[in-house]
Amino acid sequence: MSERFTAVEIISAKRDKYELSDQQIDWTVDAYTRGVIADEQMSALLMAILLNGMNSREISRWTDAMIASGEKMSWSMLDRPTVDKHSTGGVGDKITLPLAPLVAACGAAVPQLSGRGLGHTGGTLDKLESIKGWKASLSNNEMLKVIQECGAVICAAGAGLAPADKKLYALRDVTGTVEAIPLIASSIMSKKIAEGTSALVLDVKTGSGAFMSDPKDAALLARTMVDLGKRAGVSTRALVTAMDVPLGLTAGNSLEIRETLEVLAGGGPSDVVELTLLLANEMLDAVGIKPKVSPADALKNGMAMDVWRKMIKAQGGDNDAPLPVAKEKIEIKADSSGKLLTLDALKVGISAWRLGAGRQKQGEVLQLGAGIEIHAKPGDIVKVGQKILTLHSDEVARFDRAKDALVGAFSIGGVDDPIKRLPLVIERIEG
């Protein structure tokens, strides 16, 4: 079969700062998926995109081409509107876990396709696999059955959704092109648009523990994704939220499930509850639902917990089985008295990863009980010798490297010193 273009033509055009035509973009994504464009050629194009950018039309067409490489899901058979939420990830970010059943309890359908963790950011599926018997991989029919029974499902995305993105993501990871905003936006949105929900709410994290540490970059990414959703006919909005400090009081798989259960029981850390409610209200508003019972009340009265337990059971999970507990633990204590001024999310995340809560490469087996409990947050008054963190691992040998990662992770100042942290919500962006 003769090809319409050559890889060198496409690379040269973007290298020389020309716009790529719709036809060039369609061919490029399709040819790479078919193996006509070699990895080294696509690497050169990705670097040219990183350096020279893409305009909104190019990003939109690139996203459409990735969607077209696979299947597009439909939820038209459901009797309620569908809405999804996507977070760019961070440390202690367990918000999806209480959020999906909460929004379902308030009347929307939530097909939540989630991922696994890599590096210092935790993955939703890894956390849920702390629950005995819980199944991450479902067929489309199984997904539909769970969502019809429970109103929500949290599971892995099937291989048929945007397969071009899977291939490109692996290449970006090893070519220094992960940070290109056009490529990040199209990677996320190709999968989310292919999911077929009528609305999408984005939680774009910023701060030391986030993928986008600069708030300006995070806002640009959020605006780019909201625009892509709008162009695709998906009602899309975004919150840019803080990840300079870990979310909640835990970082690690089973530890975060415990915290989720506290939130669903009407308790839990105030920042986790606040962000869960903010996102729940955004999701319900995005699909035009005015619930009879508010999200805040649905957390307190057990409605959200009921959906959670049904959802876990429907996916094979044992709600009453004990959660994994690490074999060993050590405490990190305050070396002075005063006010806790900072708690660095990145350092906490790296430490949890070294304890066994995260993986260095895909497929690595996790220690589901490993991670960190947080006993004080910025603004808290602490005394010398007071516990700040508890580190959990199955292997004593992991503690030294985990402690090394925590050097400078928190600072203690005078009781009148100002704390140094971002507001929980920095910006709201709507299409």
Language model regions located:
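Acidic, glycine/proline-rich low-complexity segments that act as flexible tails and inter-domain linkers
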Residues: 1-92, 310-314, 425-431
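Well-ordered secondary-structure scaffolds
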Residues: 5, 9, 14, 19-22, ...
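Active-site-proximal beta-alpha loop/turn segments in soluble metabolic enzymes
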Residues: 46-50, 127, 165-174, 203-212, ...
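Alpha-helix C-terminal capping segments
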Residues: 51, 98-111, 191-196, 231-232, ...
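Glycine/serine-rich anion-binding loops at beta->alpha junctions
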Residues: 81-104, 108-120
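Short beta-strand segments
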Residues: 113, 147, 155-157, 203-207, ...
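A glycine-rich helix N-cap at a beta->alpha junction
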Residues: 127-153, 223-229, 233
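Phosphate/diphosphate-binding glycine-rich loops and adjacent basic-rich segments that engage nucleotide
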Residues: 148-197
